[in-house]
Amino acid sequence: MLWVIGINHKVEVDIRQKFSLTKTKLQEKLISLKKLADEVIILSTCNRTEIYFFSEEYVDIEKIFTELDWDRRYMPLFYIYKDKDCIKHLFEVVCGFDSLLIGEEQIVAQVKEAKDIAKQVGGKNPVLERLFEVALKCSKEFRTKARLNEHPITIASVVGKVLKESNIRKIAIIGLGNIGFLFCNYFKNSDVDKVFLIGRKNERIDQFVKLYPGKFEYSDKKDAISEAQCLICSTSAPHAVVHKDDIPDGKNLLIFDLAVPRDVDVEVYKLPNVKVIDIDQVHKMDATSREIRISKMQENYNIIEKYIDEFIEWLGFRQYRNLIIEVKRHAEQLCKAQVKYLKNVDSREREEVERLLIRMANLYIDRAIEVLREAHKEGSGEICSNLIKRIFLK
């Protein structure tokens, strides 16, 4: 059974942040959830926390909440999709249908990262890995055909528009991960005067400091906040990193808190000259090309349907994997047995003949597999598989 349990941007950020997982915590939970299901992948972003499962039996949601130390009172806020609905949901997510910024592209990298982390930490996930790979393949074709690059949208472009309208030219960025990099990449060609970088130095951010030395510079948090007109927060910390004491008395400051959990302490929201805009409010500012993107995406929805059918067909055909393995194993044994009858040949020649026989046998088996695949599509897979058993195994 294939299914997903999740919570997304339709639930307010104050509640959503309770279920957000840091990278370290995510890795820990992947291991613990493997006790409940054969395969697990966790997708955790600022807009959603989703857990994808593949197992022979459905896992009770209460057991999942217990394993994750989540408050069961919030269970009604979570959605659950099974089998085809689960496949459809992931494909819509990676294609941008389920994003607050409709059609945004950052989700593609996040889906890929979720797949990779699960592989590194949780071991083999053959079905879920295939699901995520097909979803990413679908997204690539969908975005190309829908020509979404002609109407790009990112958090950086939405925030940048606000800064331009407010004539803000000095910005501080706290959190130099993927979101921080996205903003640096956006600001390098903008007309802002200064970008103060707060956080651990890394190679990706270093390039901006080296190529644009007058615009980008690393800075201490308090010094940067004192100089800046705007603070952009996007760390992955499990707690607040900007506090009331970090803001000079009476300072006018615009803060974009893009982190989940929040980077900005609640006391900062109460400061009279400080305006804090959270991630959900930023997403609501996207209006310029939203309708155009929605129209283009709906026109190309058939691409998603095509890939859904492709994956369902693959998943259904998977029931024959043990038969295929057994047929190939049996054929190899027969080939090796026949080689024993060869006389007047040395060991090297015997090995070459054995390899040739196995290769020829596999050619016939591969053709039988193709016939089985066609029969499966037509609904007669069981009849065909029984014939293959009679021909190759009896």
UniProtKB/Swiss-Prot annotation:
EC number: 1.2.1.70
Binding site for NADP(+): G175, L176, G177, N178, I179, G180
Residue numbers binding substrate: T45, C46, N47, R48, S99, E104, E105, Q106, Q110
GO BP field: protoporphyrinogen IX biosynthetic process from glutamate
GO MF term list: glutamyl-tRNA reductase activity; NADP binding
PROSITE patterns: GLUTR
Claim: NADP is one of the keywords in the record: yes
Pathway entry: Porphyrin-containing compound metabolism; protoporphyrin-IX biosynthesis; 5-aminolevulinate from L-glutamyl-tRNA(Glu): step 1/2
Swiss-Prot/TrEMBL site (Important for activity) positions: H89
Top-level taxon of the source organism: Bacteria
Top EC group: oxidoreductase
Subunit-structure text: Homodimer.
NCBIfam families found in the cross-reference section: hemA (TIGR01035)
Role played: Catalyzes the NADPH-dependent reduction of glutamyl-tRNA(Glu) to glutamate 1-semialdehyde (GSA).
Miscellaneous remark of the record: During catalysis, the active site Cys acts as a nucleophile attacking the alpha-carbonyl group of tRNA-bound glutamate with the formation of a thioester intermediate between enzyme and glutamate, and the concomitant release of tRNA(Glu). The thioester intermediate is finally reduced by direct hydride transfer from NADPH, to form the product GSA.
Entry protein name: Glutamyl-tRNA reductase
